[in-house]
């Protein structure tokens, strides 16, 4: 039995479409609001947080490396996330209890490359751009 067809079936078709929409994964995700609740940033592009600890995350096969990451507790909601520290030696600019600005990292809601479970990256440390510290254009403020 297919969909109804006839002169007076518009309401039936409209209701059928409304019900069947919920079986579409992408529609359900965008309209239920659960994806927004699960997102640590709560829909924002960036978030500030406090560094809890520095950690090394092992890269997935076939690569062999320890990717430098930090555990961050977000100020806005207290959620704890793992954020990647880009560039060589930039972990040295970050200390525990520093305030950092965290941004998304590549594919939304997914880990990037060979770093398992890491969906965010560090952008600023103590309100100074991590890239500026790395290139030597700015110095870390004395605290």
Curated annotation (Swiss-Prot):
GO biological process: cytoplasmic translation; translation
Modified residues (Hydroxyproline): 62
GO cellular component term, pick one: ribosome
Annotated compartments: Cytoplasm, Cytosol; Cytoplasm; Rough endoplasmic reticulum
Pfam families listed in its UniProt record: Ribosom_S12_S23
Main location: cytoplasm
Gene3D superfamilies noted in UniProt: Nucleic acid-binding proteins (2.40.50.140)
Keywords, sorted A to Z: Cytoplasm, Endoplasmic reticulum, Hydroxylation, Ribonucleoprotein, Ribosomal protein
SUPFAM superfamilies: Nucleic acid-binding proteins
Listed GO MF terms: structural constituent of ribosome
The family this protein is said to belong to: Belongs to the universal ribosomal protein uS12 family.
Quaternary structure and interacting proteins, as annotated: Component of the 40S small ribosomal subunit.
Protein name: Small ribosomal subunit protein uS12
Lineage: Eukaryota, Metazoa, Chordata, Tunicata, Ascidiacea
């Amino acid at each position: 039995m297919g969909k109804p067809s006839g002169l007076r079936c518009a309401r039936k078709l409209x209701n059928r479409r409304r019900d069947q929409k919920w079986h579409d994964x992408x529609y359900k995700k965008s309209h239920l609001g659960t994806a927004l609740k699960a997102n640590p940033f709560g829909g924002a592009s960036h978030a500030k947080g406090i560094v809890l600890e520095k950690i090394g995350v092992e890269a997935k096969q076939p690569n062999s490396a320890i990717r430098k990451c930090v555990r961050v507790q977000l100020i806005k909601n207290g959620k704890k996330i793992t954020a990647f520290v880009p560039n060589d030696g930039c972990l040295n600019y970050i200390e525990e209890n520093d305030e950092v600005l965290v941004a998304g990292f590549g594919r939304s809601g997914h880990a990037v490359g060979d770093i398992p479970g890491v969906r965010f990256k560090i952008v600023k440390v103590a309100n100074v751009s991590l890239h500026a510290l790395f290139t030597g254009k700015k110095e870390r403020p004395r605290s």
